[in-house]
Amino acid sequence: MMKTTKKSRQKMFPLFATNKILFLLIFFCSLTLSFAEKPKQRNYRNAGPVLSKIYTGELAKDLYCGCPYNGKKNIDTIPCGFRPRENPRRKSYKRARRIEWEHIVTAHNMGHFRPCWRDGGRKNCTYNDPEFELMEGDLHNLYPAIGEINGDRNNFMFSQWTNSPEPMYGSCETIVDFKLKKVQPRKEARGLIARVHFYMEKQYGIRLSKQDRQLFEAWNKMYPVTAEECERDLRIEKYQGNRNPFVESACKEAGF
């Protein structure tokens, strides 16, 4: 059996110490990185708290009327002129007093053609279809909206049929045609709505009809990006890790 002398042990110690220090450095570096990397938002169930962080300050306005809000139940209806359509005695009236997270491309439009939807509807898709879960929770497709209008919109597609809308919600310009199942949003929301549809088509392959494409291309040109839309896109990137390329390129061109 080979004996280790005092001199050989002294030579081995620096090597052992160096390896130990190197191991500790690698361990602590990987630990630091794991804490530094925030998990990216990827599902609708956990989207609420993240969206509340995104829509603060100037971005805390609802999609359909531009009403500012502070907290989900504190909507300032004076600047936007919103007035509930429903009778205060009806249960649905409560939704007029709160902010909800609206899918610009509806969950039905994202999922009704998928096998999971046919087998059990939206809930089944949420829990059993990973791609649908990504679509449903994509922050680019979610926007704060007054609950009553969100409910009235239902699964209706966006459209444009009049330049003189007859008010339905006070002086708010968004209107809903329940018979034809379509929604005409206010002018200030149209460009953003168009660019979100382009994003969802590119990101997830949700095809647009010829009619919808023509409408959204027109809206995209008529209603260019604003500083607020560009800021929204940057905030979403912080939490989700990606930007809407149709917004990003337009923001750069506009100098935002």
Indicate where each model-derived feature is located:
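Aromatic-lined ligand-binding clefts that engage carbohydrates, nucleic acids, or primary amines
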Residues: 37-98, 216-218, 228-229, 236
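Alpha-helical and His/Cys-centered functional microenvironments
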Residues: 13-14, 28-29, 106-107
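Sec/Tat signal peptide C-region and signal peptidase I cleavage site
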Residues: 32-36
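Secreted/extracellular small peptides and ectodomain modules produced from precursors
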Residues: 27, 63-65, 78, 114, ...
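N-terminal secretory signal peptides that target proteins for export/translocation
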Residues: 1-17
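Bacterial N-terminal signal peptides
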Residues: 20-30
